[in-house]
């Protein structure tokens, strides 16, 4: 009870004190004024309200800013879409312009370039030929009728009462005065002689050979048949191996007599592909006023060196040797090949300058790509009996560009039957196993009534591979055993090597059979042991060189050589194309030489 009384008393006393003091309150922390407390509470309410307003305004501002950001983002997205559409439109316009340049402007520029470098100079040369022929004919007739020789032509010194002269010799292309080598051979010198009876003549004024410094002209093609020819090359700016492809020319024309009874060449029709760097390894075959040129198309470089990544693509270009005006696709026709019968081979392509026709069927030299795992070869057939260090597997291992390559290469022919109509169908025919070496550039041509096959020596068999064709389909060749013509080489396959080794090197240097009874051939070989140099035109048998003449100074580098021979007024002539480095600017360019095969073994 005492405790409770005290507690009550204490409360009462406190109330009294508060009533007495009125405005003062005492707590643990000290004495405070109630008015001040109330004023503080009011200030706190105002501050809280102000903070609330500020917070609301801040939230509103943040919301507004977010809305603005979203709107700006939306506008940006819309702008990006508009920009994207604009860019797509610009890209489409650029593509359309590029296509127009490629399809319309490019060919016109090419036509102008062709006219300035080929047609106009050729026509000037042809006009000069006609004038030369006319003058020569007038001289002959005046000399004959007036019974004296005219140094310069002075008609007024001749008796005007002389009979009218005979009609002068008209210009005529060789296609009207030439024939292929058929039947019995014509008379030629068959004795070994050191006399300079061969006199090469340079052909340089009617083919589009660019002589500007720094321009490399490589990958040439030459085919001559029935007085007509096909020609091709690739122009590069800078290095021959790594230069930028500028232009590829594929042209056809006639072989001409300029009045001096020496064959010349006049180009009549030229085609330039819009993408020159994609055209590789072309081969041409003539048939009834047209040359058919078959090419490999590749966007990954040379199909031989990029065989695994190359997706087989072929094209055929048909060019009229006597083009007509306003004749649609008669003059020039480009055809993409869609059907190829390749048998066990994964891919095939043309590989060599020229082929032949038999009836309505064209045959192009070719090569097939066969997976190494599917290549069947009996090592016991490898000719190592006289080779001390060669291994039996070398023949099999050397069938690819290296011993571990995915594909082996095998030579053969691509067959195209013109009479079938409809879609073009090509069929690959592989070469028989006798004397089998890696597939390389080859050539099949008709001479003296029978096809002849040449295959470049790109492997251990370095002697020239040339022989009569027993059958075209299947392709069987009677190889000659030549012991005097071999290509230069290094490493394990040097010149005159006949022992199987694993190597891949060599040059294309074909030869043309001009006498089957004595098996005499003519062509350009490289007279060097290790380096591709010293081009020499030679007439040779299997076991001896009868006579020869150098086509350049000693140590002049050269590579590919192509030779075609024919009759001009019953005299055998050959035209040889030679890839040669003698221009002084370290780039290669082809030269063409006309060489008459002498009937007599003494100089005339």
From Swiss-Prot:
GO terms for cellular component: host cell plasma membrane; host cell surface; membrane; viral envelope; virion membrane. Gene3D superfamilies: 2.120.10.10. Its main location: virion. One of its GO terms (molecular function) is exo-alpha-sialidase activity. It holds the Pfam family HN. GO terms for biological process: symbiont entry into host cell; virion attachment to host cell. It is found in: Virion membrane; Host cell membrane. InterPro entries: Hemagglutn-neuramid, Hemagglutn/HN, Sialidase_sf. Residues 1-49 are intravirion. It comes from the Viruses. Residues 71-604 are virion surface. Attaches the virus to sialic acid-containing cell receptors and thereby initiating infection. Binding of glycoprotein G to the receptor induces a conformational change that allows the F protein to trigger virion/cell membranes fusion. This is Glycoprotein G. The lineage of its organism: Viruses, Riboviria, Orthornavirae, Negarnaviricota, Haploviricotina. The gene is G.
């Amino acid at each position: 009870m005492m405790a409770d009384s005290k507690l009550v008393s204490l409360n009462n006393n406190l109330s009294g004190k508060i009533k007495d003091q009125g405005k003062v309150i005492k707590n643990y922390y000290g004495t405070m004024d109630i008015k001040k407390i109330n004023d503080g509470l009011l200030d706190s309410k105002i501050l809280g309200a102000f903070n609330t307003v500020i917070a609301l305004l801040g939230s509103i501002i943040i919301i507004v800013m977010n809305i603005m950001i979203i709107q700006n983002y939306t506008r940006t997205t819309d702008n990006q879409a508009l920009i994207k559409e604009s860019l797509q439109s610009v890209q489409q316009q650029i593509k359309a312009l590029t296509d127009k340049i490629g399809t319309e402007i490019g060919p016109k520029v090419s036509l102008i370039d062709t006219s300035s470098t080929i047609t106009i100079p050729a026509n000037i040369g042809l006009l000069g030929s006609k004038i030369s022929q006319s003058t020569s004919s007038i001289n002959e007739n005046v000399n004959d009728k007036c019974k004296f020789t005219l140094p310069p032509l002075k008609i007024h010194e001749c008796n005007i009462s002389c009979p009218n002269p005979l009609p002068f010799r008209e210009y005529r292309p060789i296609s009207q005065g030439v024939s292929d080598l058929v039947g019995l051979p014509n008379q030629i010198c068959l004795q070994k002689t050191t006399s300079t009876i061969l006199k090469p003549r340079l052909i340089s004024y009617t083919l589009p050979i660019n002589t500007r410094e720094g321009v490399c002209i490589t990958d040439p093609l030459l085919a001559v048949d029935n007085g007509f020819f096909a020609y091709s090359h690739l122009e590069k700016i800078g290095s021959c191996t790594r230069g930028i492809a500028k232009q590829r020319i594929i042209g056809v024309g006639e072989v001409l007599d300029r009045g001096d009874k020496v064959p010349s060449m006049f180009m009549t029709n030229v085609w330039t592909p819009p993408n020159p760097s994609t055209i590789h390894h072309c081969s041409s075959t003539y048939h009834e006023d047209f040359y058919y040129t078959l090419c490999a198309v590749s966007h990954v470089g040379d199909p031989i060196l990029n065989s695994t990544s190359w997706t087989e693509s072929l094209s055929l270009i048909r060019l009229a040797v006597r083009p007509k005006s306003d004749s649609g696709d008669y003059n020039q026709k480009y055809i993409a090949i869609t059907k190829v019968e390749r048998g066990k081979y994964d891919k095939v392509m043309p590989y060599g300058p020229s082929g032949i026709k038999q009836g309505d069927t064209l045959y192009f030299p070719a090569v097939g790509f066969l997976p190494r795992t599917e290549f069947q070869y009996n090592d016991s057939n490898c000719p190592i009996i006289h080779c001390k260090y060669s291994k039996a597997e070398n023949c099999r291992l050397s069938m690819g560009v290296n011993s571990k390559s995915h594909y082996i290469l095998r030579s053969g022919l691509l067959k195209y039957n013109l009479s079938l109509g409809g879609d073009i169908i090509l069929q690959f025919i592989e070469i028989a196993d006798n004397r089998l070496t890696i597939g390389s550039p080859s050539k099949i041509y008709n001479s003296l009534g029978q096809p002849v096959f040449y295959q470049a020596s790109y492997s251990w068999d370095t002697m020239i591979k040339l022989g009569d064709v027993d059958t075209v389909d299947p392709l069987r060749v009677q190889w000659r055993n030549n012991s005097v013509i071999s290509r230069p080489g290094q490493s394990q396959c040097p010149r005159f090597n006949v022992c199987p080794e694993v190597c891949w090197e060599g040059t294309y240097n074909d030869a043309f059979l001009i006498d089957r009874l004595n098996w005499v051939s003519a062509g350009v070989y490289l007279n060097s042991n290790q380096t591709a140099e010293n081009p020499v035109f030679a007439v040779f048998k299997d076991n001896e060189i009868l006579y020869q003449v150098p086509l350049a100074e000693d140590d002049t580098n050269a590579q590919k050589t192509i030779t075609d021979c024919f009759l001009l007024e019953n005299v055998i002539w050959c035209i040889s194309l030679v890839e040669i480095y003698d221009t002084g600017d370290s780039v290669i360019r082809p030269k063409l030489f006309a060489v008459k095969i002498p009937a007599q073994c003494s100089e005339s």
